[in-house]
Curated annotation (Swiss-Prot):
Span of chain positions assigned to the transit peptide in the UniProt entry: 1-17
Top-level division of the source organism's lineage: Eukaryota
MF term (GO), any: metalloendopeptidase activity
Keyword GTP-binding attributed: no
Organism the protein comes from: Candida albicans (strain SC5314 / ATCC MYA-2876)
Keywords, sorted A to Z: Electron transport, Membrane, Mitochondrion, Mitochondrion inner membrane, Respiratory chain, Transit peptide, Transport
Name of the protein in its database record: Cytochrome b-c1 complex reductase subunit, mitochondrial
Length: 439
């Protein structure tokens, strides 16, 4: 085994930071990546492999999630097994106590080693019913529906556009042979990572996995780059109580040097919820505008990143169907400011919010384990929280303005909406809001 470490140069005990990610390459080529934290009350360990809906086509859409759900349904004494399904990877995570992490690691290794036998002996009927119910739930929830169709419209023609859990139609036709072909292609040593987080000994866990993991050799499948397409999808439904919309531009990928810059830019506009007790004290200028004219109930800006591309924009819920166009006008005109008149105070506040959000997202061993796996699989390494904070702190106002000029100003947008969207005017009307006369 080849052992290494990207640990922090010094442990900041006051904040109880983790010791950084430690890596071990097993004799079979699989990477074990762990982050230990002496303050952790529980531990998690997971098997992750690059796949997800991006590895599928329209006829096999859902096979990644179905296969992972089957593997995660095995009995697990002393551990809680959970399936993790994303657009670019899948995982089976065992949550357990710190003292039981070695046994959980053996369990994960056993599932990986016997994945083919597990799938061959499993009747997929109930699993397909469960996955179809999950896919239907996505379409039944307005927010999930809008964002799912936003990705599908933005990356249409590419596998990145496919729903993470498939559709009821595609799932119905999946068979055991589809899962076996999926495993043969994606569950291979160069496409697999064992990730873990908690309070345990890295070397003991790596040794336990080394002794129990048998996995096929294979190369990491190549992914076809996805192009962003300015477009729109409208799913008007007047039976719903509100308008649910999302507007976005082409964002940054996980591998982009501007990954954190995009997050700071999104945080400049932030979130707003009309019925919150702190609504009147929300800082961004857009929040003041929407309260003055009472044109939106809630919105949140986001920067969603995949391995090589991303989406940057907002999701909004509007109770008054006659103010949809008002909100899109004011929100997109605020985006114009990103490359013109963003202030030092706005950037400083946004940087603080991004750092807080990052720390909050990694508040438990399950979240840290998933984050380690995602970054190692899709980027090749994972930065520590300290390194991320240093990059965020280095962002200046001019950096944000330059990013706004190149990624937001007068750029194509993608629009997705459902509910009372009669007042969501045509694409060209909103596209023209992406710039303004300057002299």
């Amino acid at each position: 085994m080849i052992r290494g470490s990207s640990a922090l140069k010094s442990l900041t005990s006051r904040r109880l930071y983790s010791t950084g990610v430690k890596y071990t390459t097993l004799s079979n080529g699989v990477t074990v990546a762990t982050e230990t934290n002496p303050a952790a009350k529980t531990s998690s360990v997971g098997l992750f492999f690059g796949a997800g809906s991006r590895s599928e086509h329209s006829h096999s859409n859902g096979i990644s999630a179905l296969t992972t759900n089957v593997l995660a349904s095995q009995s697990a004494k002393g551990s809680l097994l959970t399936a993790k399904n994303d657009r670019e990877f899948n995982g089976i995570i065992a949550q357990t106590t710190n003292d039981n992490i070695t046994e959980a690691g053996k369990l994960i290794a056993s599932i990986a080693s016997n994945a083919v036998d597990i799938v061959e002996k499993t009747d997929l009927t109930k699993h397909k019913q469960y996955l179809s119910a999950q896919a239907s739930a996505v379409e039944a929830d307005p927010k999930s529906k809008v964002l799912s169709h936003l990705y599908s419209s933005a990356f249409q023609g590419y596998s990145l556009a496919l729903p993470t859990l498939g559709t009821t139609e595609s799932v119905e036709n999946l068979e055991n042979q589809d899962s076996l072909r999926h495993l043969a292609k994606h569950l291979v040593n160069n496409n697999t990572v064992i990730a873990a987080s908690g309070n345990f000994d890295h070397d003991k866990l790596a040794d336990a996995i080394e002794a129990n993991l048998k996995i096929a050799e294979g190369v990491k499948p190549e992914i076809k780059p996805a192009s962003f397409l300015g477009s729109e999808v409208r799913m008007r439904d007047d039976t719903l109580p509100k308008a649910y919309i999302s507007i976005a531009v082409h964002g940054e990928g996980l591998n982009s040097p501007n990954y954190y810059l995009a997050k700071v830019a999104a945080a400049i506009y932030g979130d707003f919820y009309l019925h919150s007790t702190i609504a009147k004290f929300t800082s961004p200028k857009l929040a003041s505008i929407v309260q003055e004219y009472n044109i939106v109930e809630s919105y949140n800006h986001y920067s969603k990143s995949f391995s090589d591309t991303g989406i940057w924009g907002y999701y909004a819920e509007i109770a008054d169907k006659f103010t949809v166009d008002d909100f899109t006008h004011f929100s997109l005109k605020e985006w114009n400011r990103l490359s013109i008149s963003i202030s030092e105070a706005e950037v400083a506040r946004a940087k603080a919010q991004v750092k807080t959000a990052l720390a909050k997202e990694l508040a438990n061993s399950f979240a840290v384990t998933s984050d380690i796996a995602e970054k190692v699989l899709l980027v090749g390494h994972r930065q520590s929280l300290r390194e991320a904070f240093e990059k965020i702190d280095a962002i200046k106002v001019n950096d944000v303005k330059e990013w706004g000029k190149s990624k937001v100003w007068d750029r194509d947008i993608v629009i997705s909406g459902t509910g009372l969207i009669e007042d969501l005017l045509d694409y060209n009307r909103n596209r023209n809001e992406m710039a303004m006369m300057r002299w």
